[in-house]
């Protein structure tokens, strides 16, 4: 498991997800994120048009008595050189039973499709293991200025157990062809 952890965390450090969004953590749960059967891999680029529908998020860990919270954010809003609105919240699903996928959880913040305007944005999926099944009603006046670390502290989620990110930038007409 230790090697898996190192292999999984390195691209998150290189992509500055660890640092900008998350504190260093040891991945202990396998999470697969896919859009129309295309798996999300750390640092790979996806076109916004290919991520317009909600992804499938599978959790390979825990059991049906363990519960997970999934958070999806963009730390590069409005642009990576001056992300003064960071983090932008895209999605929160809570109470996802282990060994299932996000459709079995409770969506507390609906999925918002990525719309990067300036530069290349990172879209980060973070998975936390909950200490127990619980009601999470985040008070989110705006999707901008969300803070994943504060959210984890507020709901006693501890460090993440998994994370993955992809890059996307605005599609021009030429790139869509």
UniProtKB/Swiss-Prot annotation:
Effect of residue 105 to D: In tfl1-1; early-flowering and terminal inflorescence
Main location, first listed in the record: cytoplasm
InterPro entries, per database record: PEBP, PEBP-like_sf, PEBP_euk, Phosphatidylethanolamine-bd_CS
Subcellular location: Cytoplasm
Alphabetical GO biological process terms: cell differentiation; flower development; meristem determinacy; negative regulation of flower development; protein targeting to vacuole; response to sucrose
Keyword check for Secreted: no
Summary of the tissues where the protein is detected: Expressed below the apical dome of inflorescence and coflorescence meristems, and in inflorescence stem.
Molecular function terms, GO-annotated: transcription coregulator activity
Cysteine-cysteine disulfides: none
GO CC terms in record: cytoplasm; nucleus; plasma membrane; vacuole; vesicle
UniProt KW keywords: Cytoplasm, Developmental protein, Differentiation, Flowering
Domain of life: Eukaryota
Family recorded in the similarity comment: Belongs to the phosphatidylethanolamine-binding protein family.
Function text: Controls inflorescence meristem identity and is required for maintenance of an indeterminate inflorescence. Prevents the expression of 'APETALA1' and 'LEAFY'. Also plays a role in the regulation of the time of flowering in the long-day flowering pathway. May form complexes with phosphorylated ligands by interfering with kinases and their effectors.
Misc remark: Mutagenesis of His-88 to Tyr converts the repressor of flowering 'TERMINAL FLOWER 1' into a 'FLOWERING LOCUS T'-like activator of flowering.
Protein name: Protein TERMINAL FLOWER 1
Organismal lineage: Eukaryota, Viridiplantae, Streptophyta, Embryophyta, Tracheophyta
Gene: TFL1
